[in-house]
Amino acid sequence: MMTLYPVVVQERTTGEVLMLAYANEEALELTKKTGYAHFFSRERQKIWKKGETSGNTMRVVEIRRDCDDDAYLYIVDFPEDKVACHTGNRSCFFKVEHRFEETGSPTFWLELYRLVRKRKEEMPEGSYTVKLFKEGKGKIAKKFGEEAVEVITGYLQNDRENLVWEIADMMYHLTVLMADAGVTVQDVMRELEKRRK
C-alpha cells in the first residue's frame, strides 16, 4: 500500500501558509529533482505538479520533515501575484473558523498590503487610502514623512503608548507608498533576508 504524507506549503519570505496537499515517495523525489512542488492527487490517483495548468508553480527552496517523519513542509518562493487556491484566493486557509482574540499575526502586514493594493485597484468612494492615491506621489510621500517625524518624536519623548500609535500610522503610510510604487512586502522581506548575518 502506498504511503501518503501530508505536505504543508509555506511561503519563504512571509511565512504565510499557502496550502496543504499530499505526497507519496515519487512526488517527493520529483520535487527534490526538479525544485518544483509535486503532490499526489488522492482524487485522480496520480502525481501532479502544482501550477501545471494554472501557471501558479511553486519553487521549493527547502523541504523539512516533522519529528515523527510522517509529514513534510515545503518552503517555497511564491510571488505575490500568484494564487495557491483553486478558489482564486492567495492561500487555501482564508476561512476563519474561530478567532479567540486578536493575535497580531506576523502576516498582518501582508494582509494590510493586499487591502491597500485592492483599494488602489478598485478605488471605492469614501476611502482615505483612495484619497491618498488620488492626490498622488507628493501627498503620499509627505504623509509618510510626517508620520516618520512623529515616530522619532515619540521615541525621543520616551512615550511608549504614543510611539506604538505613531509606528502604526507610519507603517500604514509606508504600505500605501509601497503599493503605489509597486514594491511588495515580499520584495522588502527578501532584501532584509539578504542582509541577515
UniProtKB/Swiss-Prot annotation:
Keywords: Amino-acid biosynthesis, ATP-binding, Cytoplasm, Histidine biosynthesis, Hydrolase, Multifunctional enzyme, Nucleotide-binding. It is found in: Cytoplasm. Residues 109-197 are annotated as: Phosphoribosyl-ATP pyrophosphohydrolase. Gene3D superfamilies: MazG-like (1.10.287.1080), Phosphoribosyl-AMP cyclohydrolase (3.10.20.810). GO terms for molecular function: ATP binding; phosphoribosyl-AMP cyclohydrolase activity; phosphoribosyl-ATP diphosphatase activity. GO terms for biological process: L-histidine biosynthetic process. Pfam families: PRA-CH (PF01502), PRA-PH (PF01503). Residues 1-108 are annotated as: Phosphoribosyl-AMP cyclohydrolase. The keyword Protease does not apply. One of its GO terms (cellular component) is cytoplasm. Pathway: Amino-acid biosynthesis; L-histidine biosynthesis; L-histidine from 5-phospho-alpha-D-ribose 1-diphosphate: step 2/9; Amino-acid biosynthesis; L-histidine biosynthesis; L-histidine from 5-phospho-alpha-D-ribose 1-diphosphate: step 3/9. Transmembrane segments: none annotated. Its EC number is 3.5.4.19, 3.6.1.31. It catalyses: 1-(5-phospho-beta-D-ribosyl)-ATP + H2O = 1-(5-phospho-beta-D-ribosyl)-5'-AMP + diphosphate + H(+); 1-(5-phospho-beta-D-ribosyl)-5'-AMP + H2O = 1-(5-phospho-beta-D-ribosyl)-5-[(5-phospho-beta-D-ribosylamino)methylideneamino]imidazole-4-carboxamide. In the N-terminal section; belongs to the PRA-CH family. In the C-terminal section; belongs to the PRA-PH family. HAMAP family: HisE, HisIE. This is Histidine biosynthesis bifunctional protein HisIE. It comes from Thermotoga maritima (strain ATCC 43589 / DSM 3109 / JCM 10099 / NBRC 100826 / MSB8).
